[in-house]
Amino acid sequence: MADKILRAKRKQFINSVSIGTINGLLDELLEKRVLNQEEMDKIKLANITAMDKARDLCDHVSKKGPQASQIFITYICNEDCYLAGILELQSAPSAETFVATEDSKGGHPSSSETKEEQNKEDGTFPGLTGTLKFCPLEKAQKLWKENPSEIYPIMNTTTRTRLALIICNTEFQHLSPRVGAQVDLREMKLLLEDLGYTVKVKENLTALEMVKEVKEFAACPEHKTSDSTFLVFMSHGIQEGICGTTYSNEVSDILKVDTIFQMMNTLKCPSLKDKPKVIIIQACRGEKQGVVLLKDSVRDSEEDFLTDAIFEDDGIKKAHIEKDFIAFCSSTPDNVSWRHPVRGSLFIESLIKHMKEYAWSCDLEDIFRKVRFSFEQPEFRLQMPTADRVTLTKRFYLFPGH
């Protein structure tokens, strides 16, 4: 019986499952009515670590009997073949499976298929309700075998301790509130958790408080057993940097982007040496609209490009100290970024949508290129996301589900 199998595999499941698979299981079990909304919320909110969530989830389902347990097992076999291999599970058709799905003649589609169809029917925004596509084990192995020296290695899910930091400022003493930013915060946190990161969230900080949080994050011992990290900053911004909550024309409460790089570089954060460090910034970088009226001829002076800044004496040294970074900003320098009061930021929405859709098959820089392409012919306001200070030396595949 499936419930007995699940109990027998309990310890292995707790030690091996990723947070992405846990979240997928919760969605599947809610959809199949194995769990109700209250049970799902309790598992998510009452447990801090992924292992605690896994333990609570496994115990909940096994107590509900063989039918519920079979749905649990079938999902793992279909959506996380790597975990299924570790647990030695098989999703062979059985009477138990069909009892749970008899109200659908064609059988239930996967949770991702169901959600995609639901999005088309109810008009919800893609990217907010989409599902992260997992990378099949065969695809991950193929990518790795083809170019092992050109891809950043990932650590085993059972031992790695990935961390991510989100700083989101929504309320300010002298600036307007960032209406809709809570959507960005919620969706970005869920995405990073699905990708296997434990997410630290900090809200409404001054520049000094942001510096303190980044320094503490850089010093976290978990980075030693992690293969990468994400830092996400969402706030008002100006050309000089990211606004703290007390910023005004009289109070220069600004976190410079350069300061973030300095706090996370090899000298200050040696635990992340040779590991990808991704910085996402949703903030204006000026007050310009990011659009010009085109004319048939434009004079470009060669001198405009041959500035001293390109030929810094210590460039080689910086490349070694500041390595394996990529920053993705919501707009080009000097220009504004746009935010919808219901949907959230256009940049964050597009980024999450493309990460969910393509992370299983594309490296991060390719995903960022797809995000930029989505802004090439804008439907609403004009802005163009840009990658800054890219020192990645290899391709960074996220391999969702692994």
Curated annotation (Swiss-Prot):
Changing D122N: In C71 mutant; abolished cleavage and ability to generate caspase-1 subunits; abolished ability to process inflammatory cytokine interleukin-1 beta (IL1B) and ability to induce programmed cell death. Residues 98-125 are annotated as: Disordered. The keyword Cell membrane applies. GO terms for biological process: AIM2 inflammasome complex assembly; apoptotic process; defense response to bacterium; defense response to Gram-negative bacterium; defense response to virus; membrane hyperpolarization; mitochondrial depolarization; osmosensory signaling pathway. High level expression seen in spleen and lung, low level expression seen in brain, heart, liver, kidney, testis and skeletal muscle. The active site is at H236, C284. The record marks D103, S104, D122, G123 as: Cleavage. Keywords: Apoptosis, Cell membrane, Cytoplasm, Hydrolase, Membrane, Methylation, Phosphoprotein, Protease, Thiol protease, Ubl conjugation, Zymogen. It comes from the Eukaryota. Disruption phenotype: Mutants are resitant to vaccinia virus (VACV) but not vesicular somatitis virus (VSV) infection. They show lower viral loads in the lungs compared to wild type mice, they produce higher levels of type I IFN, IL6 and RSAD2/Viperin after VCAV INFECTION. The modification Phosphoserine is found at S301. GO terms for cellular component: AIM2 inflammasome complex; canonical inflammasome complex; cytoplasm; cytosol; extracellular region; IPAF inflammasome complex; microtubule; mitochondrion. It is found in: Cytoplasm; Cell membrane. Belongs to the peptidase C14A family. It catalyses: Strict requirement for an Asp residue at position P1 and has a preferred cleavage sequence of Tyr-Val-Ala-Asp-|-. The gene is Casp1. The two subunits are derived from the precursor sequence by an autocatalytic mechanism. Thiol protease involved in a variety of inflammatory processes by proteolytically cleaving other proteins, such as the precursors of the inflammatory cytokines interleukin-1 beta (IL1B) and interleukin 18 (IL18) as well as the pyroptosis inducer Gasdermin-D (GSDMD), into active mature peptides. Pfam families: CARD, Peptidase_C14. Residues 113-123 have a biased composition (Basic and acidic residues). This is Caspase-1. Residues 1-91 form the CARD domain. It comes from Mus musculus.
